[in-house]
Regions:
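Short sequence/structural segments immediately N-terminal
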Residues: 3-8, 16-114
């Protein structure tokens, strides 16, 4: 089959590149690298739902995380003086976009958020 329209061919190529890069970069690469598929965090609903902290702590031990970050200064981000340990993980940790320092909305803490 011969394509007579170079614009159609270019669009077809672009669609293929975008779809494959989106599938590879949908986020959660760290989880995928460990064999965790999307449904583990997002369920099987369509469209997928954002995971709640209860989902995160099924695999990520909250007490171990608080201990691991206990020496971070000026304060441990996982034991907030405002929220205790009840702050949603997704306030800082984003799998499908850059993570952010939720505390920096009010404070000048220089946390590096994975």
């Amino acid at each position: 089959m011969k394509f007579r329209n170079p614009i159609f061919l270019a669009l077809l190529s672009l669609a293929f590149v975008c779809s494959t890069s989106t599938a590879a970069n949908l986020g959660g690469e760290k989880h995928a690298a460990k064999g965790v598929n999307c449904a583990v965090c997002h369920g099987t609903t369509n469209p997928p739902i954002a995971p709640e902290t209860a989902t995160c702590i099924q695999c990520h031990d909250k007490k171990a995380l608080m201990e691991k970050t206990s020496k971070i200064k000026p304060t441990n981000p996982h034991t907030s003086p405002h929220y205790g340990d009840d702050l949603d993980c997704t306030n800082c940790h984003k799998m499908h976009s850059p993570s952010e320092n939720y505390c920096s909305q009010c404070h000048n803490f220089e946390y590096k958020v994975p």
